[in-house]
């Protein structure tokens, strides 16, 4: 099994993805060879109204040795996330040695802060000004801070399987995910899937 120790799943253009690669070889024989990696981007194909998978970066680590019954360090990936990605994109980082292949989803976003239009009132609190703007038919962008005082009646979001759910173990958080309408215009420039993921 090829393991990549990613620090995170979301990156900005211009960052360098650095991650240690390990091989868990608990098979009957030693494993050796070149470790190959490819960063695949899911790029929109507007002519066909679909998405195509394109290799944007690739490389290898030579002569990796993985003795049986061990967890071996293969090396460290350093992938510069620049120049080929011009819009937010979902990618797969695929790593392979011999017959062992593994893939990790990552998302890359533009390194820019969007500007709020003057016609929109942006706030982190539902204050009197926000209510006044709404009462007058205006638009409010409400983005509360991610802290307990902003969400005092909410539960912490986390991934949880049905087996390890709050129904079985009552002291853990109860959220399991979301069902997302991924073709909604809201997500036009935000790559998403129909289910919760790490982005």
Predicted regions and their residues:
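Proline-enriched interdomain boundary motifs that mark the N-terminal boundary
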Residues: 2-5
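Outer-membrane beta-barrel proteins
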Residues: 7-9, 25, 67, 81-83
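Hydrophobic beta-strand core residues of beta-sandwich domains
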Residues: 11, 66-71, 85, 134
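Beta-strand-rich binding/interaction modules
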Residues: 16-63, 72-80, 87-98
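Low-complexity, Pro/Ser/Thr- and charge-rich linker/hinge segments at domain boundaries
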Residues: 107-125
